[in-house]
Amino acid sequence: MLTLHRVRGVRAVPDGPLAPGHAVVVDGTRLAAIGPYEELAAAYGTGAAGAPGRARLREWDGIVTPGRHEPDGAALLEAAYHPDPREADALGSEPLTGEALAALGRSAAGMPESRWGASARRGLQRLLAAGTTSLTGPFTRPAVRTAVRRSGLPERPGPGPRPLTAGGPATFAIVADDGTALATVVAGRLVHRRH
């Protein structure tokens, strides 16, 4: 299904120039086109979802960017525990590291693989909410590795996210003026949207 994301502009590379009035068209897992909104709307149309040759329209008060790359992905997901909201009274809501994490491991509940997996899923949600579109591993804990794979976030050794190009992966973030991620799209899937 085609989706036309109408935004205030597109920044195809991190810290690159902003193309005001540009938009992106997503076709499955790929970026079908990047260009001025009016041209894309004329070429792809907008209308009811599923209508032949017509794109669904999503409008955002932000700009499309490649998103952010998390170089410390392994440390954030394997050396920190992201508490369940039901644990907030006892553990707080911020990730636990160092001695607090060691003490948690010594507790009666301990840190079995299932708990690491749940922690990683919550950590990944935090990353997606921040507009993260790639991260660096390697991930040695099986439950964490599984959570990362299921999230769809690409594991990359590089210094940053890939530039946005027509025909390239539909992986990007939409950010507000203050840098807040409004939405994160990974391989064409809207995986996070700020309410």
For each predicted feature, which ranges?
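Conserved beta-strand scaffold positions in the cores of enzyme catalytic domains, especially
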Residues: G53-R58, P154-R156, T184
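Non-catalytic sensory/regulatory segments that transmit input signals in bacterial signaling proteins
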Residues: L4, G28, A103-S107, A118
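Alpha-helix-centered segments that form part of catalytic cores
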Residues: R106-A130
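Hydrophobic beta-strand segments of well-ordered beta-sheets in folded domains
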Residues: T3, R54-A55, L128-G137, F172
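N-terminal metal-binding scaffold of metallo-dependent hydrolase/deaminase domains
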Residues: M1-A51, G160-T180, V185-H195
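Active-site loop-helix segments enriched in His/Asp/Glu that coordinate
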Residues: T133-P161
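General structural feature for long, well-ordered alpha-helical segments within catalytic domains
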Residues: S119, G123, T140-V144, G160, ...
